[in-house]
Amino acid sequence: MTIMRKSHPLMKIVNHDFIDLPTPPNISGWWNFGSLLGLCLILQIFTGLFLAMHYTSDTLTAFSSVTHICRDVNYGWLIRYMHANGASLFFMCLYIHIGRGIYYGSYLYTETWNIGILLLFLTMATAFMGYVLPWGQMSFWGATVITNLLSAMPYIGQDLVEWIWGGFSVDKATLTRFFALHFITPFIITAMIMVHLLFLHETGSNNPLGLPSNCGKVPFHPYYTTKDFMGVILLLTLFMTLVLFFPDKLGDPDNYTPANPLNTPPHIKPEWYFLFAYAILRSIPNKLGGVMALAFSILVLALLPYLHTSKQRSLSFRPLSQTLFWMLVSDVIALTWIGGLPVESPYIMIGQVASVLYFSIILIFMPIAGLIENKMLKL
């Protein structure tokens, strides 16, 4: 008699993807972040669902409804802080996941990689809309500044901005539609993740060596379920430490002031996970140029499969490319730091240098390093 997990139509899908999935025997802890992202998404959907039960998407009551959640709802403060810090955790895992993909050459699975970039855009849009919902000072002004960037688009820019706003400024219509979209996008992300996994399981996982491992694959369960569970325990420990001891560490104090269109905060900035892109946007004096650089800072990832010049897939045995990779990581950290600082000297110059370096490493230096390494290794 066949085992139920191998014969039942629904169980067969689960079995194929999470139990009997052939997996390379040597994948390291850097491969844990895919499953951790799944955990973060589940956390965000459930905490968001409970918050939506008490939240009101009206400009007059949005701020006080968030206060009501924290003060009057049973464990409302915990749900609210889990949701707010869960977004930070999500992006931390997401950036590590992308970094691992770049380091080990996972971008050569082009379909999986491109779906991943689409997922990144969707996640960024979801997080941005969520940041607007508490209707604090930074929520309101962040929404005004970031949506207003679309007006830089020739011909249709101003009409597009007014269409998104639902009027001539960020107001009740904007808040209502942002709430509706913020609620639905996680489910679109979930569907896209299914497609992401579908393409990944067509090719199989990459490994640290970047070599085919078909001859030595092992089943996903129990080896990697145990390994992933260890990652889950560590992540939840870090997460609950942040939520229970430092809940406001990653937030902005200005967001504890209700939105006031007549009073502009001294320094408008998005959440920390958007600061690197915000720094690139600010480093170009021209509005349209800045918006294009902002979009291209993410879209440049889609060019990686076509800029791969090395005969080796992974960076494991390529010291020159490794150096450039860690320079890129340092540069993104520097951009994140600069994005949170005021627009004044010397920060403007540092931001411009870091922005040029960001694109130069990806578009020029890494492809050249690949060719040099081929030459040195006589490949």
From Swiss-Prot:
Gene3D superfamilies: Cytochrome Bc1 Complex, Chain C. Pfam families: Cytochrom_B_C, Cytochrome_B. The chain crosses the membrane at residues 33-53, 77-98, 113-133, 178-198, 226-246, 288-308, 320-340, 347-367. Heme b b566 binds at residues 97, 196. The keyword Metal-binding applies. GO terms for molecular function: metal ion binding; ubiquinol-cytochrome-c reductase activity. Binds 2 heme b groups non-covalently. It is found in: Mitochondrion inner membrane. SUPFAM superfamilies: a domain/subunit of cytochrome bc1 complex (Ubiquinol-cytochrome c reductase), Transmembrane di-heme cytochromes. Heme b b562 binds at residues 83, 182. Keywords: Electron transport, Heme, Iron, Membrane, Metal-binding, Mitochondrion, Mitochondrion inner membrane, Respiratory chain, Transmembrane, Transmembrane helix, Transport, Ubiquinone. The keyword Cytoplasm does not apply. GO terms for cellular component: mitochondrial inner membrane; respiratory chain complex III. It is a multi-pass membrane protein. Its cofactor is heme b. One of its GO terms (biological process) is mitochondrial electron transport, ubiquinol to cytochrome c. A ubiquinone binds at residue 201. Belongs to the cytochrome b family. Component of the ubiquinol-cytochrome c reductase complex (complex III or cytochrome b-c1 complex) that is part of the mitochondrial respiratory chain. The b-c1 complex mediates electron transfer from ubiquinol to cytochrome c. Contributes to the generation of a proton gradient across the mitochondrial membrane that is then used for ATP synthesis. The cytochrome bc1 complex contains 11 subunits: 3 respiratory subunits (MT-CYB, CYC1 and UQCRFS1), 2 core proteins (UQCRC1 and UQCRC2) and 6 low-molecular weight proteins (UQCRH/QCR6, UQCRB/QCR7, UQCRQ/QCR8, UQCR10/QCR9, UQCR11/QCR10 and a cleavage product of UQCRFS1). This cytochrome bc1 complex then forms a dimer. Heme 1 (or BL or b562) is low-potential and absorbs at about 562 nm, and heme 2 (or BH or b566) is high-potential and absorbs at about 566 nm. This is Cytochrome b. It comes from Cratogeomys goldmani rubellus. The lineage of its organism: Eukaryota, Metazoa, Chordata, Craniata, Vertebrata. The gene is MT-CYB.
